[in-house]
Amino acid sequence: MSQQVIIFDTTLRDGEQALQASLSVKEKLQIALALERMGVDVMEVGFPVSSPGDFESVQTIARQVKNSRVCALARCVEKDIDVAAESLKVAEAFRIHTFIATSPMHIATKLRSTLDEVIERAIYMVKRARNYTDDVEFSCEDAGRTPIADLARVVEAAINAGATTINIPDTVGYTMPFEFAGIISGLYERVPNIDKAIISVHTHDDLGLAVGNSLAAVHAGARQVEGAMNGIGERAGNCSLEEVIMAIKVRKDILNVHTAINHQEIWRTSQLVSQICNMPIPANKAIVGSGAFAHSSGIHQDGVLKNRENYEIMTPESIGLNQIQLNLTSRSGRAAVKHRMDEMGYKESEYNLDNLYDAFLKLADKKGQVFDYDLEALAFIGKQQEEPEHFRLDYFSVQSGSNDIATAAVKLACGEEVKAEAANGNGPVDAVYQAINRITDYNVELVKYSLTAKGHGKDALGQVDIVANYNGRRFHGVGLATDIVESSAKAMVHVLNNIWRATEVEKELQRKAQHNENNKETV
């Protein structure tokens, strides 16, 4: 009988560290709920002590996620563990994940300590975390470069202190698969109490071996794999969860393990993470790339037509990718749109049907036929922008030509007031952005601009993703339209609304902090 491998997702913690712009609480929650639908066992959603915003996002997710265990990261520091517990206490089930470096290099140069002191600190902090929960994970940072005898000492001590999961990270992506498997096997041989904890692995892709190392560790006895959707993360990224999950499913014959993942949700979750994080998926990416199930060779095409198993070790349907494209028109009713969303696997709670149908009709009037990829793009943008907007694009007009200076006129609703400005720029998009900056006085600096066609043909929707700097922070915005300048303007307005909301949240947190301080003085 096969054993279950626990899937531990760190997209919202380790994965987010790679992003050019921080995610909002709403965006993090959207990803967390998708991960819950996909069936991850544990999701690590933040580092609460790092900032009030991270604390709030962990607390919000912990309150709303019911079917996955929510986890927060903490260094082996008292305050870290206490703050993590405070952010998680609203959850139905939670885990505290604490860590400390164990390699000679890290101990000597980073911690300026000794192995004995590290073990003593680990014991104390694991016990402190156990005061808050029975589910405590302990990680040996840089375990891949820690001598096996030292690693075994730390692991044994952490388990004795109450750690229920022991994580063995290849923090810098240094080890080879056969080497990493040897580390796991070595721990099983050397640690007498190892049966009292689940052995976990956390691998990085610096040498392109993250997935290989994780699978080698599973083969050697590890029963939890940590990773991120699409492999996002520090430097070259984390272990790609979708790759590990499907490798376990496809090669059950040799690994003899399974996961509790709903494989039908993999593709949608991957696409959502890509969109929200503004990190496009390479076409040749295993499992979820657009070319993962494409066959261009005539020999391969002939073989697939005769029997898909000739050249496909899994099907697009096995990851939830429905390749049947049904087109709708402006004559299609709300029921038809809802029916198509149902067929694509979307629940009503994931989108606002009224808003989606309004956007669908406007698009159908422009391009005639609306396809599945159009609907998905409209649903995504609608979800991103469904909160009340302080800024709203009311009107814009652009004049430009090969020998003309681009000029834009923009009218923007700012709360209850409508303001208008005109400006010149280096092209129509820049002119629109200059006019918007004049209206708001936010003076944002554009850091990144990317345009992606959502669909096919000359009438495809254009999605613009931008990253902008404001007061030392980076904000992401997205816009969608058949007109590139319009989608660019909408993306900047989305950035402005994100800045406004972040500013309002900071003001509210400051008010609460001041209120608490006043109460202390009164007492």
UniProtKB/Swiss-Prot annotation:
Main location: cytoplasm
Cofactor: Mn(2+)
GO terms assigned for molecular function: 2-isopropylmalate synthase activity; acetyl-CoA C-acetyltransferase activity; manganese ion binding
Pathway of action: Amino-acid biosynthesis; L-leucine biosynthesis; L-leucine from 3-methyl-2-oxobutanoate: step 1/4
Residues binding Mn(2+), per UniProt: 14, 202, 204, 238
Keyword Transferase: yes
Biological processes, Gene Ontology terms: L-leucine biosynthetic process
Catalyzed reactions per annotation: 3-methyl-2-oxobutanoate + acetyl-CoA + H2O = (2S)-2-isopropylmalate + CoA + H(+)
Residues covered by region (Regulatory domain): 392-523
Compartment(s) of residence: Cytoplasm
Protein name: 2-isopropylmalate synthase
Presence of the UniProt keyword Iron-sulfur in the record: no
EC identifiers of the protein: 2.3.3.13
The protein's assembly and partners: Homodimer.
The Pyruvate carboxyltransferase domain, residue ranges: 5-267
InterPro entries: 2-IPM_HCS-like (IPR050073), 2-isopropylmalate_synth_dimer (IPR013709), AIPM/Hcit_synth_CS (IPR002034), Aldolase_TIM (IPR013785), LeuA/HCS_post-cat (IPR054691), LeuA_allosteric_dom_sf (IPR036230), LeuA_bact_synth (IPR005671), PYR_CT (IPR000891)
Pfam families: HCS_D2, HMGL-like, LeuA_dimer
Family: Belongs to the alpha-IPM synthase/homocitrate synthase family. LeuA type 1 subfamily.
Function (record text): Catalyzes the condensation of the acetyl group of acetyl-CoA with 3-methyl-2-oxobutanoate (2-ketoisovalerate) to form 3-carboxy-3-hydroxy-4-methylpentanoate (2-isopropylmalate).
Highest taxon listed in the record's lineage: Bacteria
Keywords, alphabetical: Amino-acid biosynthesis, Branched-chain amino acid biosynthesis, Cytoplasm, Leucine biosynthesis, Manganese, Metal-binding, Transferase
GO cellular component terms attached to this protein's record: cytosol
